[in-house]
């Protein structure tokens, strides 16, 4: 009904404007010196065409600006839901490990579970769920600080932390923690969170804004912190949780530095290329990786990944690569779809993450990309 009404109004307004202009121009006919002069038949035809185009433009504008009666009523009826959104909110961001259906798991819980899955594969938790060793952790890409809080705090710091916090005996803590992120905005946000943690307990935590993929670019302050942590620790680990495939020009300069200079173990959630990927799939993926800021050099098969770790110096028997793709891509795409629907009820949406939803759905459907947990011990 409303669409038809807007069409009629658009046409009426357009031709009304057309007639006003036409009458005005006719009034200028006697003035030959005027810029317009006598319109004539060609001029009248031009004015008619102009009117049609104006009507079409008005129709396009109104249809773009207006929704159906039902949709409009729904949005206006629920927009006050925005006023109930609680801030600050959890700021976890990785692909997550989805044990259950996406509708019964929050993103924060899935992100936490991906971290726990990596820690478990690395052997940090015994049957009682307690850490067996005192270690120094270098976290490459700590995001907005949620995983830092989870790894270093005995209890939730903010009220929003309680929504994803699990039993304390299932959480790992470390003696020394150094985090690196390239994102200055996230570094500032995470630093505020860590200051809140330090007020509660004297944790040995240092955060730096630097390019984790280029150890040669790290400043002296970062190098000094790492040296001090190494001296006061018996064991060293590097964590790259859903970050290493972004490292440019590739992840390997960093891993070589980790092995030779830091003499550290390596654990990560990373992406690999399926060994059965077709030429067409590889071509499409190559284009996508360029758009997502992930160098193509980082997309190797799991076997190639293992071989490269061996070339760096890790022993074959100390390398473990576990495929968890079925718990990552398809359920993440389903979650994003459901979240988009929920947010649209409030007149919002997931924005640019809609493109990511399509990509994750493709990965989950075809298996062209594999999500793996990588552990390499010295």
Predicted regions: what they are:
Residues 272-296:
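Short, glycine-/aromatic-enriched active-site segment of Class I SAM-dependent methyltransferases
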Residues 252-265:
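A short glycine-rich, Lys/Arg-flanked "PGG" loop and its adjoining helix->strand segment in the class I
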Residues 14-86:
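N-terminal auxiliary segments of SAM/dcSAM-dependent transferases
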Residues 136-215:
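Class I SAM-dependent methyltransferase SAM/SAH-binding core
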Residues 297-313:
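Short alpha-helix
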Residues 108-133, 150:
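Conserved alpha-helix/loop element of class I SAM-dependent methyltransferases that forms part
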């Amino acid at each position: 009904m409303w669409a038809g009404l807007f069409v009629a109004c658009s046409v009426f307004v357009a031709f009304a404007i057309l007639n006003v202009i036409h009458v005005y121009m006719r009034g200028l006919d006697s003035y030959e010196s005027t810029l317009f002069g006598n319109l004539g038949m060609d001029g009248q035809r031009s004015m008619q065409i102009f009117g049609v185009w104006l009507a079409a433009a008005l129709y396009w504008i109104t249809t773009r600006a207006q929704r159906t009666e039902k949709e409009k009523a729904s949005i206006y009826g629920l927009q006050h839901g925005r006023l109930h959104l609680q801030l600050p909110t959890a700021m976890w961001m990785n692909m997550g490990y989805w044990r259950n259906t996406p509708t019964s798991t929050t993103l924060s819980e899935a992100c936490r579970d991906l971290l726990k899955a990596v820690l478990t594969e690395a052997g940090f938790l015994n049957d009682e769920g307690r850490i067996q060793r005192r270690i120094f952790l270098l976290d490459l890409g700590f995001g907005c600080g949620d995983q830092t809080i989870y790894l270093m705090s005995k209890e939730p710091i903010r009220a929003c932390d309680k929504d994803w916090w699990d039993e304390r005996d299932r959480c790992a803590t470390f003696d020394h923690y150094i985090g690196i992120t390239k994102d200055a905005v996230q570094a500032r946000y995470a630093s505020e969170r860590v200051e809140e943690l330090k007020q509660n307990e004297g944790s040995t935590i240092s955060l730096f804004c630097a390019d984790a993929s280029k150890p040669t670019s790290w400043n002296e302050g970062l190098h000094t912190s790492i040296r001090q942590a190494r001296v006061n620790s018996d064991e060293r680990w590097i964590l790259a949780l859903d970050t290493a495939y972004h490292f440019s020009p590739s992840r390997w300069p960093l891993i070589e530095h980790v092995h030779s200079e830091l003499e550290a173990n390596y654990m990560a959630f990373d992406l690999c290329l399926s060994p059965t990927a077709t030429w067409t799939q590889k071509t499409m993926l190559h284009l996508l990786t360029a758009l997502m800021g992930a160098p193509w050099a980082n997309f190797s098969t799991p076997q190639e990944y293992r071989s490269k770790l061996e070339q760096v110096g890790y022993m074959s028997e100390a390398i473990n690569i576990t495929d968890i793709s079925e718990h990552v891509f398809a359920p993440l795409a389903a979650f994003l779809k459901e979240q988009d629907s929920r947010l649209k009820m409030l007149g919002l949406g997931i924005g640019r993450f809609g493109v990511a939803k399509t990509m994750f759905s493709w990965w989950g459907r075809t298996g062209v990309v594999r999500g793996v947990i990588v552990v390499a011990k010295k």
